Amino acid sequence: MQVFWFLPTHGDSRYLGTAEGARQVDQAYLQQVAVAADTLGYEGVLIPTGRSCEDPWIVAASLIPATRRLRFLVAVRPGLVAPTLAARMAATFDRLSQGRLLVNLVTGGDPGELAGDGLFLDHAQRYEASAEFIRIWRETLAASHEGAALDYTGRHLSVKGARVLFPPVQRPHPPVYFGGSSEAAHALAAEQVDTYLTWGEPPAAVAEKIADVRRRAARHGRTVRFGIRLHVIVRETEDAAWQAADTLISKLDDDTVARAQAAFRKMDSAGQQRMAALHANGIRRSRAELEISPNLWAGVGLVRGGAGTALVGDPHTVAARMREYADLGIDTFVLSGYPHLEEAYRFAELVFPLLPRAVRDTLPGSVLNGPFGEVIATGIVPRVAAS
């Protein structure tokens, strides 16, 4: 099991849907979150893309020297950059970070935003172009280790003599992550990506996705890893966690929710449609209605696009729910919480000790070098929680 955190390059706050409780998200703050994730033992951080975010590649590059082991899951969008240029960017980043790059292929699901970037392909065409993009990207980087060039002719993209002179550290290329809920997305994932990501749906729905991608991958003689993108609201007690969930959306008003849902309805993303269905396009608002599966809460999706669900509960409950997903085949958890700095610490302190031994063994610290807590009475080193 791998646990990732999230860099809030689109903003951060104590509440959703309001400027109240918001904080300045600048390089200094993003560095705080990244360094926290690095020192706490998260495998890496997801850095999102889109017009609502800071540029992920520039943000990630700025954080290389501030971190030691943290991996960067950086989004790339086909159509905004040539696949060969994206390959050179990835190779350079991987070399400068000494092999810490992961690439998140993002097709995009908002036709309005895509048109603003000069992309006018429909849903099916975007996935065709994305498949060609990532094939050129992968094969160009793989060829770079042998000093070879690539020729490729596709419907949307073609290259002749594509070459990367300085290969990435990772062979044959940095791992590729990708998420999507449509049939076209599953087909692309099965044929070309290393890890398929899903947004946080109830376990039965996630199991169906995993089974479908696995079947498709087997036809290509491939195996694919699986990850899930979730928010987390964990507190020392169940009641406190649900109170925190209520507080997170306590500033929302009907107009804000309605405007957000209207924007989501204009998207052609199958995943976004599935997220919206979990709360009936903003109609469901009570805790009972938003708890769509035990401890899985759809309140975040009332106003947030993309990942719209959170695991809510005490540490043991949240860890148990994660194990349920792991039993389905999920081995990568990409998590976040509001505000992201404090919640990175809270989740690590409360839940990491309850995760499988393989996760705990990778965490910083040991009996000799901490963490200990404050020394007691000038000479007693705390070892375990007080009973």
Curated annotation (Swiss-Prot):
| Top class in the EC scheme | oxidoreductase
Q: GO MF terms on file? A: alkanesulfonate monooxygenase activity
User: Which reaction is catalysed here?
Assistant: an alkanesulfonate + FMNH2 + O2 = an aldehyde + FMN + sulfite + H2O + 2 H(+)
Q: What is its EC number?
A: 1.14.14.5
Going by the UniProt record, its keywords in alphabetical order are:
Flavoprotein, FMN, Monooxygenase, Oxidoreductase
Q: A GO biological process this protein is involved in?
A: alkanesulfonate catabolic process
InterPro entries (alphabetical)? Alkanesulphonate_mOase_FMN-dep (IPR019911), Luciferase-like_dom (IPR011251), Luciferase-like_sf (IPR036661), SsuD_RutA_monooxygenase (IPR050172)
Q: Output the PANTHER family linked to this UniProt entry.
A: ALKANESULFONATE MONOOXYGENASE (PTHR42847), ALKANESULFONATE MONOOXYGENASE-RELATED (PTHR42847:SF4)
What the record says about family reads: Belongs to the SsuD family.
Per its database record, what is this protein's job?
A: Catalyzes the desulfonation of aliphatic sulfonates.
Q: What is this protein called?
A: Alkanesulfonate monooxygenase
